[in-house]
Amino acid sequence: LKCNKLVPLFYKTCPAGKNL
């Protein structure tokens, strides 16, 4: 899944540093 801070579910799948 692509990093997407607009979607909490996707946001949680983002590695640290990739959640910007």
From Swiss-Prot:
It is found in: Secreted; Target cell membrane. GO terms for molecular function: toxin activity. GO terms for biological process: apoptotic process; killing of cells of another organism. It comes from the Eukaryota. Expressed by the venom gland. The keyword Transport does not apply. This three-finger cytotoxin has antiproliferative, cytotoxic and apoptotic activities. Both in vivo and in vitro experimental results suggests that this protein possess anticancer potential. Also shows neurotoxicity, cardiotoxicity and myotoxicity. This is Cytotoxin drCT-1.
